[in-house]
């Protein structure tokens, strides 16, 4: 059912569930729903981990503390294996990226109509609850990683070293500078683009499949497809968060390597 109360066709149902709650227009359009849910999930991550840190004990830990410790050790192990260098920011960044993206992805397992229907009852016409299925969110996170790549590249190599890396690789000859510059610029830009679009594409496809199941099948038969897909989607949710974290660490490790 739409915001105006009319019964939607399957096509209208799908279109309605893929429409964001927005303000502004054109380039300045802001997807309010994606912003709200991403901030709330980020706050949930900070609150829960801080709560565990404050109440951490050297005795017998609780279930939540055990889970957090396992998660921290998992991320720390990946950082030690991938990142070659010393940097106190990388491990916390990796943990934040993994948990935050996982929580955003996890919203995809909530029944399609559950939160949007409740929002409609309160007068909110449109609501999408999976922030990582919004390309603006995923590309914003990837852009943040891109700026960190530039920052650490310049910090470690200096402006001259960074420019030299862009102009004298892979062909170390002045005549090849234009070709090198094009190749290295494309390589550099492709990192955040692929990082953001990979996460968006996988989560958008997953959300769309849930919506298609809900929009095209009778309510009593939806579980036949939605339950197996949800079980499989748990793997995708976790894997995409892991891939984003690992590639972030890899890119930052590469940024701090001085190729001379």
From Swiss-Prot:
Residue stretches spanning the membrane: 27-47, 90-110, 132-154, 208-228, 230-250
Organism listed in the record: Aeromonas hydrophila subsp. hydrophila (strain ATCC 7966 / DSM 30187 / BCRC 13018 / CCUG 14551 / JCM 1027 / KCTC 2358 / NCIMB 9240 / NCTC 8049)
Keyword check for Iron: no
Disulfide bonds: none
This protein's GO CC annotations: plasma membrane; proton-transporting ATP synthase complex
Protein name (Swiss-Prot/TrEMBL): ATP synthase subunit a
Main location: membrane
Gene: atpB
One GO MF term attached to the UniProt entry: proton-transporting ATP synthase activity, rotational mechanism
Key words, A-Z: ATP synthesis, Cell inner membrane, Cell membrane, CF(0), Hydrogen ion transport, Ion transport, Membrane, Transmembrane, Transmembrane helix, Transport
InterPro entries: ATP_syn_F0_a_bact/chloroplast, ATP_synth_F0_asu, ATP_synth_F0_asu_AS, F0_ATP_A_sf
Cited function: Key component of the proton channel; it plays a direct role in the translocation of protons across the membrane.
PANTHER family: ATP SYNTHASE SUBUNIT A, CHLOROPLASTIC
CDD domains in the cross-refs: ATP-synt_Fo_a_6
Subunit annotation: F-type ATPases have 2 components, CF(1) - the catalytic core - and CF(0) - the membrane proton channel. CF(1) has five subunits: alpha(3), beta(3), gamma(1), delta(1), epsilon(1). CF(0) has three main subunits: a(1), b(2) and c(9-12). The alpha and beta chains form an alternating ring which encloses part of the gamma chain. CF(1) is attached to CF(0) by a central stalk formed by the gamma and epsilon chains, while a peripheral stalk is formed by the delta and b chains.
Topology of this chain in the membrane: Multi-pass membrane protein
Sequence similarity: Belongs to the ATPase A chain family.
Top-level lineage group: Bacteria
GO BP term (any one): proton motive force-driven plasma membrane ATP synthesis
Compartment annotation: Cell inner membrane
């Amino acid at each position: 059912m739409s915001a105006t109360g009319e019964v939607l066709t399957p096509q209208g149902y799908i279109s309605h569930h893929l429409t964001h709650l927005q303000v502004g227009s054109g380039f300045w359009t802001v997807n309010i729903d994606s912003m709200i849910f991403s901030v709330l999930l980020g706050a949930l991550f900070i609150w829960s981990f801080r709560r565990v840190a404050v109440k951490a004990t050297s005795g017998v830990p609780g279930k939540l503390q055990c889970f957090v410790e396992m998660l921290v050790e998992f991320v720390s192990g990946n950082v030690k294996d991938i990142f070659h260098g010393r940097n106190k920011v990388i491990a916390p960044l990796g943990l934040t990226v993994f948990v935050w993206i996982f929580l955003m992805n996890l919203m995809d397992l909530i029944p399609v109509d559950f939160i949007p229907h409740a929002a409609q009852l309160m007068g909110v016409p449109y609501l999408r609850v999976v922030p990582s299925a919004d390309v603006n969110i995923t590309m914003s996170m990837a852009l943040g990683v891109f700026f960190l790549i530039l920052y650490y590249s310049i910090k470690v190599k200096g402006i001259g070293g960074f420019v030299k890396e862009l102009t004298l690789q892979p062909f170390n000859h002045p005549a090849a500078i234009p070709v090198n510059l094009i190749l290295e610029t494309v390589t550099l830009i492709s990192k955040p683009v692929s990082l953001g679009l990979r996460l968006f594409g996988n989560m958008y496809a997953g959300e769309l499949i849930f919506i298609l199941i809900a929009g095209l099948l009778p309510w009593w038969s939806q579980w036949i497809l939605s339950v197996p897909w949800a079980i499989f989607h748990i793997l995708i949710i976790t894997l995409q968060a892991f891939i984003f974290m690992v590639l972030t660490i890899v890119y930052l490790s590469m940024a701090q390597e001085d190729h001379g």
